[in-house]
């Protein structure tokens, strides 16, 4: 991908995502406090905690697709992640799970107690290019490129889905089509390599 095409991709993707997530997540307003975080104490396998680095965030097309999003495991326990991701009843994702819908945003499941208000998920705002990934912001409270708080959208997911927004999980639908999301995913400018 040429540098010019990569720049155009970043600008267009950021603009589309900004508008979509801003509308879908209530225009940046605070979420209702009625949805408690899911419990991870009894169903989450006890895998070691992780300290995600930029190198952990790879081209989406090298990750495992589940529905509209992509998943991976920073601990090497992809089968445990997939068991939860494919369950119609949901479940608690294991420590080290990585979930991404688009190249510029990610969430990683951290150790129990990391952030009870986010179900122990760490959110990431990423800058992607043909050279790879840079972490722009990370933590329990992350303002992404459009200025919205990641957790405010994900808190709306039904408790059994452990903060992961999927079709019929309780999150607000995105005001962009599945085709647009698929195009953004397919045009991930990062190098394709095995994860």
Which residues fall in each region the model found?
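Bacterial N-terminal signal peptides that target proteins for export
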Residues: 2-14
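C-terminal motif of bacterial Sec signal peptides marking the signal peptidase cleavage site
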Residues: 22-24
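N-terminal leader/targeting signatures
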Residues: 17-18, 43
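N-terminal secretory signal peptides
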Residues: 37-95
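Intrinsically disordered, low-complexity regions enriched in Ser/Pro/Gly/Gln/His and often acidic
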Residues: 2, 18, 114-116
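Sequence context surrounding c-type heme c attachment/ligation sites in exported
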Residues: 31, 36-38, 44-47, 65-66, ...
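Bacterial signal peptide processing site
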Residues: 26-29
């Amino acid at each position: 991908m040429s540098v010019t095409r990569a720049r155009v991709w970043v600008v267009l993707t950021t603009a589309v995502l900004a508008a979509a997530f801003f509308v879908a997540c209530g225009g940046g307003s605070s979420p209702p406090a009625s949805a408690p975080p899911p419990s991870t104490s009894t169903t989450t396998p006890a895998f070691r905690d992780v300290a995600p680095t930029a190198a952990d965030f790879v081209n989406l097309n090298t990750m495992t697709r589940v529905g509209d999003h992509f998943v991976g495991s920073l601990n090497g326990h992809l089968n445990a992640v997939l068991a939860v991701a494919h369950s119609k009843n949901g479940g608690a994702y294991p420590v080290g799970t990585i979930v991404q819908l688009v190249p510029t945003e990610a969430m990683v499941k951290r150790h129990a107690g990391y952030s009870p208000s986010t179900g122990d998920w760490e959110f990431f705002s990423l800058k992607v290019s043909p050279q790879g990934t840079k972490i722009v912001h990370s933590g329990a409270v992350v303002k992404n490129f459009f200025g919205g708080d990641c957790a405010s959208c994900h808190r709306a997911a039904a408790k059994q889905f452990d903060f992961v927004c999927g079709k019929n999980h309780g999150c607000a639908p995105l005001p962009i089509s599945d085709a647009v999301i698929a195009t953004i995913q397919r045009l991930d400018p990062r190098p394709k390599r095995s994860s």
